[in-house]
Each structure stands twice: as C-alpha cells, then as structure tokens.
C-alpha cells in the first residue's frame, strides 16, 4: 500500500503544487476566496469528484464527493484557502498561515484515497471551508449537520520544524461593546458630556482586574475600533472588541458572562448606553479523537515518517473544534521549514514555496489518505474511533 500511495502522490504532485502556488500568488481574504475555491473545485472535478458549489449558502464553500457503488465509511478531508490581511505585497493579503498549502494537502489526500474506494467501498469527501481566520465556515457547516453523515474528518496545518500530533485548541467567543455617550466641548463644558471613551477604558480596566480570578487557560484580548474624533470633543460614540478564550467551552460560557458584566459595569459607571453583539462565530475547543490521532501517526510511520511529536502547547482557536463535537476529528501539523518561523508572517508564507515544504505537503497528504484507507478496510478500527467519539458525548 505504501508503494501505491507514493506512486499516486507522484502522479498528481504537479497539479497539487500548481494549486498551492496559484493560491499563494492570488491571496484572498475569508468569504471572498472566489478564485481559490474555483481552482479547488476544478481540480477535484478533473479527478472524478462530483462538486457542489456554492455550498450551504457560502459562495466560496464547496463539497466534493467521490462515491463508490459499494457501501462503506465516509471519510472527510477539510480544506482551507483564506489569506490574512496585511501580509502580502503593498500591504495586501498574504498566506501567512499557509492555507494555500493546507487546502492543497487536503485536496491531494482526497484524490489519493479516491483511487481505492471503488474497490473498498465508501465515500471520500473534500469540504472547502472558507474564512477559517474569521467567520469559520466549519462552524456553520457543523450547525447545519454537514458532518453528521461522516465517520472521520481530518485537516493538517503547516507549521515549523516538526510534525505534531493533533492536540487541543481553545474555545473562543467574541463580543463587541458599543458605547453611546453625549458630545460636549472638553474644555469649556465638560460637565455636559458623557464620555464613551471612558466607558471603553473602564471596560479594559474591569477585564484586567478580572484576570486575577481566571483559570490559567483563559485568554481575553481586545482592541479599540472607535475611540473618538478630536481631543477637544468628549467622545459620544466608541467601540471595543474582544476575543474571549478558554480550554473548554463549558468554562468559556461562564467567563464570557463575566466579560459581559465588565462592559455593563462600565456603562453604568459612566452613564453611557450600551449595545453588545458577537462579531464572529464562536469556536468550540478541539476534542481530538485519539484513536484517529494514533492512526494518522501510524500511517505516517508506514510511509517512512518518524519522530512525530506530541501536541504542542501554543494553543490558538480553530473552527475544527466545532467539527470535533459532531464527528471524530484530528488537526495535526506538518513542517514546511527546518527553522522556527512564526506563523502569520510574510516569512512563513514564503516558506510554502520551497521544495522542502512541497515534499512535506505530499508526504502528509499520503499519510492522511492512508489513515482513511485503514478506516475503509478495517472495521475494528472504525469501531474503536466511534466508541471513543460516543464517550465524548
């Protein structure tokens, strides 16, 4: 099987590299990845997949399926292709998180596995999931039941230096505080004003005080998006936004309400009116299916990849977390550089263009496909994955 997978990977490599490179050269922000999603869909159609696009109301989402006439498990590979603002040429978007390569890896894994399902039975599904960096299409997909007919979902993210097994991520929710005060001349009639900027500053102060009583896994970080227009005018309208994160979604719910109270208290203290809203979708924590995680590691070893590291400790938040509560899921990492380069940088984006990165991309796609093959052909493996997932619920 190793030889077959390696041979297929060689056959499709030029197309997969071209896909990754084209998206690198034409970076698109979340929900406007029109060319990127088009390129994904066209390549999958070329290799016999039936593609639905747009998908679930998202213009840049898609679902590509290769179905056997025989029954069997349904294996999903999730693809991302959104860029980050400010990391490209002339301050435009750029692929500082390597999603050009991430998406190509999932497409490659789907194509490789599709070569076997006519014999084994089952489905191969490649899901195009826009806007991971912001709105997180996987959240909407999970809410709409997209993953409920799938037996396993995989996605592998580029990183530096080492391979890492799938680990944890932080649950995350968002909140925007919009304060309404009353303008006045800041020197001649300050007593006539109600200072919306004071409310914003007090919100930050309240949250900073809250940090003393939060758990070690809690993270709260925010920005001021509107802070007034002139120094001699008391600001009448100011806005701030926060990400609120925690290790588990149950604690996040409690922490989020505490942050809400910080904003309410600031409004009360300053006399401002307050409107609140989430400005992005909430992400659940990632509940890695360890049986599937071990299977991926085993599959990579079968292809000659040793030294896969335990999960890292630098937790962010991923929309795959929402998937992990409705379908057995893993989110491991593969290296695209031999030196430590931070993500969300121009240097990391450039690393996706190296031969080393492209070798690891194809290697990883093969491992994902081989893990899928084991599920398709080994009922006991699928049973163990399902058993662990049911215990999560």
Protein language model features and the residues they cover:
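Metal-dependent amide/peptide-bond hydrolase catalytic core
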Residues: 197, 201-393
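Sec/Tat-exported extracytoplasmic proteins
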Residues: 20, 27, 145, 211, ...
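Histidine/acidic-residue-rich, glycine-tolerant segments that coordinate divalent metal ions
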Residues: 60-63, 83-96, 100-101, 116-235, ...
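Acidic/His- and Gly-rich active-site-bordering loop/insert found
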Residues: 2-96, 100-121
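Structural motif
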Residues: 73-76, 123-125, 151-154, 329-332
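Non-cysteine beta-strand/loop elements that form the S-adenosyl-L-methionine
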Residues: 76-78, 175, 180, 331-336
